[in-house]
Regions:
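A conserved active-site cap/scaffold subdomain adjacent to cofactor or substrate pockets
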Residues: 292-332, 346-353
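A conserved regulatory-domain signal marking ACT and ACT-like small-molecule sensing domains
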Residues: 328-497
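Leucine-biased recognition of intrinsically disordered, low-complexity hydrophobic segments
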Residues: 10-13, 26
Length: 497
């Protein structure tokens, strides 16, 4: 090699080092807001090593919005799936809740004991539990006396009690997280947004703004509670989905490079519990429109009312699997469209009911469905799907929305009202507006002996919706995933993974 060639080589190497250094610098300066759910929080050793400490160059510049440990909010409010009452129901029904609060303290301390090996100072953590339970007891007792007076609206008082109780779980997990991080030598800051020790009449946005306005995020690790106290009441609209609202509002406030949601699973082409893990394809990339479609049938990547502010702010959301830290997960952005036509997700729900109105006078009548929509509105019902023909209108509703009162009002006004429990199966993708997808979907279900009761698709063609009998829900998911998401991969029979 002559001198000039050697010189050029040295220059190239030098520039490579410069670019590598700059890339590493930018990586270390990246700001992210990250939500960690309750199931992941209960496996905090995995969270600590797979998320918080996994990349030594990315320890700082991160805000973690944490949920309560798995099962705690069920104990505080009610079981999310079964509805089994918790402490809130005791308060709301005028029953004694002191013993339940004492049992809660024991449960939280048992959780604390499980994290001693990670460096959690047990005496400090247990003292926090005792203090917070005592404060909550005082607040609840005060509310009970106010409720007994009859001077204030019962609904507002109960909502305040519900928020006080809900906040305990997030404050507990956030406090523990900070103490464990400090024990690991990390500069960690607690942002307890429950506001137990202040009486400021801030809105949720104001509390978040004041909490983060003077924080050096780039050089800190911040752990924030998923619950935020505010004058409007975060649970008034979102109830158990409040942690996503806090996550969203913090992201909009600090404008991170990325918002990350850590779950115990990947966003995949179909539920691995139905199709088998080997047949569940990780989505990888999609857009906010697809995320909205998922939420509409109960498969929430993130609640639409929490995601919309981030979408408008241009903040990308990354969904990651807590237990696979090296995998980039799935990135949700505003304008993503797949380079090639591809069905991304097959999903749906078995917890839906078809309500059909049949009336021969409907044909040619302008605004016939206006009265029907008015009835749904009075019952505070949002429908999932709507389909019509000359004499019939079908609305797909969540099971819990189909009350005897609703059906009685419909039957009093319309000739024939048919109520049929069923299931919805959706074929979703950011780029599926091509000939043949609907035909392949119908063929796949026909081969699986699945009868389609109703079909819906809009002009944007991001979501094909099929109503099927409930017993056909899982066979339909398996058939559609196999036909539309695994065309170039070998199907692995269930049980053979």
């Amino acid at each position: 090699m002559d001198g000039s060639a050697a010189c050029r080589t040295l220059i190239v190497l030098a520039w490579c080092r410069v670019f590598a250094a700059r890339r590493n610098y930018l990586r270390t300066r990246m700001i992210s807001v990250e939500k960690i759910g309750g199931t992941s929080m209960s496996a905090f050793d995995q969270v600590l090593h797979h998320i918080m400490l996994q990349d030594k160059s990315r320890i700082y510049g991160r805000i973690y919005v944490v949920s309560a440990y798995s099962g705690v909010t069920n104990q505080l409010l009610e079981h999310k799936k079964t509805g089994e009452p918790g402490i809130y129901a005791l308060f709301a029904n005028g029953q004694d809740y002191m013993v339940a609060l004492a049992n809660l303290a024991d449960s939280l301390k048992a959780i604390n004991a499980g994290f001693v090996s990670l460096g959690l100072p047990l005496d400090v953590a247990n003292a926090f539990v005792d203090q917070r339970i005592a404060e909550a007891r005082e607040h609840l007792n005060a509310l009970r006396h106010v409720l007994a007076s009859g001077y204030l609206n019962r609904k507002s008082v109960l909502l305040a009690a519900r928020e006080i109780l809900a906040s305990i779980g997030e404050s507990h997990s956030a406090f523990n997280s900070v103490e464990i991080l400090k024990a690991q030598g990390v500069r960690a800051i607690l942002k307890d947004l429950a506001g137990f020790h202040d009486s400021k009449a801030w809105t949720i946005d104001e509390r978040i703004h004041h909490s983060f306005k003077d924080v050096d995020i780039a050089n800190s690790v911040i752990v924030a509670t998923g619950y935020t106290k505010g004058t409007e009441g975060i649970m008034r609209e979102f109830d158990r989905g409040y942690s996503e609202v806090t996550f969203s509002k913090i992201a909009v406030e600090v404008r991170p490079d990325e918002a990350v949601i850590h779950k115990e699973f990947h966003l995949s082409s179909a539920d691995p519990n139905i199709v088998g893990l080997a047949n569940a394809v990780i989505v990888g990339a999609t857009n906010y429109d697809v995320a909205d479609q998922l939420a509409d049938v109960g498969m929430e990547a993130i609640h639409p009312k929490a995601s919309k502010p981030m979408e408008h702010a241009g903040i990308p959301i990354r969904l990651k699997n807590t237990f696979e830290p090296e995998h980039p997960g799935t990135l949700i952005t505003k304008d993503y469209v797949g380079e090639s036509a591809r069905v991304e997700i097959i999903t749906g729900s078995e917890q839906v009911t078809l309500v059909e109105i049949h009336d021969p006078h409907m044909v040619g009548t302008v605004g016939f469905d206006l009265g029907l929509v008015g009835i749904l509105s009075r019952h505070n019902i949002s429908y999932i799907l709507k389909a019509t023909n000359a004499n019939s209108i079908v609305h797909l509703l969540w099971d819990k929305a189909v009350t005897p009162e609703l059906i009685a009002e419909l039957q009093a006004k319309y000739q024939v009202v048919t109520v049929k429990p069923c299931a919805i199966v959706c074929v979703i993708g950011s780029n599926i507006a091509i000939p043949g997808v609907l035909a392949r979907a119908a063929q796949a279900m026909a081969e699986a002996k699945v009868n389609v009761n109703c079909i819906s698709q809009t002009l944007r063609q991001v979501n094909m919706q099929f109503l099927v009998d409930r017993e056909d829900y899982k066979p339909a998911i398996i058939a559609l995933n196999r036909a539309l998401c695994l065309p170039s991969r070998a199907f692995v029979p269930l049980g053979c993974e």
